[in-house]
Structures are given as C-alpha cells and as structure tokens.
C-alpha cells in the first residue's frame, strides 16, 4: 500500500512544494552577478571547493548517485555551454551538475527566492548562483553575467522545470524561454536527467544520472523557432531517459485523483 505521506497532489506543473522563506524576494538594484574582487574570488574558491568535497560523500553515500555519459561534457572545456536538468533534489541539484561538469566550473540560474534562505542564501552567490531579475536593468546585468561566464568557457546550469519536485520520476513540460540562450551565444547544449531506481536495502532510491548531447540550436531558424526546436529535442531526450526510473519514492498525482 502506498504511504500517504509520500503522495503529493498538484494542480499544475508550476506548483511549489519547496518554499523559501520569502517566495516574493527580488534581487536588489545594486546586486552584483559578477564578483571578481580578490576577497570574493578567494571566498568563492574556498566555498566551491568545500562543497565539492562535501558532495563527494553526500552524493555517493547519501544519494547513491551513479553518473552515465559524463565524458560527453569534456568538449565543453573548449567552448563553455549550457546544461539543462530536471529539478528533483534540494541539495543534489546543487552538487550533481558540478560533478558532471568537473573540472569545468558551473554557474546555476536560480530563483531569487533562494537568496532569502537563512545562511545558505548568503553562500549561494559564491557557489555560482545566478538569480533571475525582475527589472529591465537587472535582466541586462543578468544576461551580461551569463555572457561573461561563457566567455570564460564555463558551464551554465538551467532547470527549465523551475520548481523543485523532490524525487519526481517524470519530466514536467517546460517553456522554451531559457532555450534562446544557446542560439544567442552560439554555444552547445547538453542535458542531465536524474532517474530513480529501487535499492536492495533502504527506503530511498538509487539515483542514476544520464548526460546527453551536444544539442545545437538550428542556425536556419529564427530565434523563437530555434528555441522551440531545441527545447523539444532536449525535452524528448529527457523523457526517454526518464523511462529508466523504476521507483516512485514520492508519487505525484493531479488533484482530480485526490479522494477525501
């Protein structure tokens, strides 16, 4: 019998199951997406290195992660690029892309609400968090930060599903908005699909991550059409990989299925 504590009901794929302290938080006008003064760079190296060391143990022994296809990202060392992923782990989604892309440094597009989390919110910028902006001037500096990191041949991580659904074993549909970047900056795209399998011992599943790509934006299509096609290519690939999920540790059901 399914454990009711592990059934979650949703109205739409934009429902939030993980709430930050302030979901309406916006980045201030003086926010710095790129911090390259000596102190900030030193702090970033230290915090990122500690996160990697912590992640080795947490992902290997806590989440039981196995990565397949990691070598496909090797080519990104010469170009930089984008890595799209499904959003299903609160801590793992911070660490797993770093392992997949290593030794390439990652910078992750995040909701500004994450910056409102006590303690962690102050650390996130030094881990490479790039919060989205709500103003025109903020969006300009946000995209300039992405362009700057790509010029350094870094990896930009994007979770197009946008909302964290812990242990979700299927791919939620997502818009093409974030898929305009690869064509605009002429960079390759990859995808990272997290899947779940039952372990012989223990309640929580084993995680298998599949890395696929590169996917190239169609140069003959307009910006929107190219973004739609790239989105479809990556979405279909992720859905195919998600079929390797054989265990639903948390089951997600639409509200119509909920019976009092």
Cite the ranges covered by each PLM segment.
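Residue-level "edge-of-site" marker
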Residues: 71, 137, 195
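Membrane-anchoring hydrophobic helices of lipid-metabolizing enzymes
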Residues: 1-82, 92-96, 121, 126, ...
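Structural motif corresponding to alpha-helix initiation and N-cap regions
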Residues: 67-70, 117, 140-143
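Non-catalytic C-terminal accessory region of glycerolipid acyltransferases
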Residues: 1-25, 142-260
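A conditional alpha-helix N-cap/helix-loop micro-motif detector
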Residues: 63, 135-140, 171-172
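Soluble or luminal CAZymes and related metallo-dependent hydrolases
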Residues: 46, 50, 137-138, 226, ...
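Catalytic core of membrane glycerolipid acyltransferases/transacylases, capturing the structured
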Residues: 75-136
């Amino acid at each position: 019998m399914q454990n009711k504590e592990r059934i979650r009901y949703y109205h739409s794929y934009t429902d939030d199951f993980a709430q930050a302290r302030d979901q309406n938080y916006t980045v201030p006008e003086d926010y710095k997406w790129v911090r390259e003064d000596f102190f900030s760079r030193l702090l970033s190296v230290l915090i990122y290195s500690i996160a990697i060391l912590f992640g080795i143990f947490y992902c290997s022994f806590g989440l039981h992660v196995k990565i397949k296809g990691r070598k496909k990202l090797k080519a990104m060392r010469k170009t930089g690029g984008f890595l799209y992923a499904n959003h299903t782990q609160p801590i793992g989604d911070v660490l797993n892309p770093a392992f997949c892309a290593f030794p390439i440094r990652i910078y992750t597009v995040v909701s500004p609400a994450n910056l409102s989390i006590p303690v962690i919110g102050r650390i996130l910028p030094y881990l490479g968090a790039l919060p989205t902006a709500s103003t025109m001037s903020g969006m300009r500096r946000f995209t300039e930060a992405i362009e700057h990191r790509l010029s350094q041949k870094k990896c930009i991580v994007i979770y197009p599903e946008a909302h964290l659904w812990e242990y979700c074993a299927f791919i939620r549909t997502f818009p093409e908005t974030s898929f305009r970047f690869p064509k605009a900056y002429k960079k390759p795209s990859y995808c990272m699909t997290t899947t779940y399998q039952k372990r012989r011992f223990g309640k929580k599943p084993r995680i298998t991550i599949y890395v696929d790509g590169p996917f190239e934006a169609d140069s003959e299509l307009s910006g929107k059409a190219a973004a739609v096609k790239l989105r479809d290519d990556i979405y279909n690939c992720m859905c195919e990989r998600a079929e390797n999920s054989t265990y639903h540790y948390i089951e997600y059901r639409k509200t119509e299925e909920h019976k009092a």
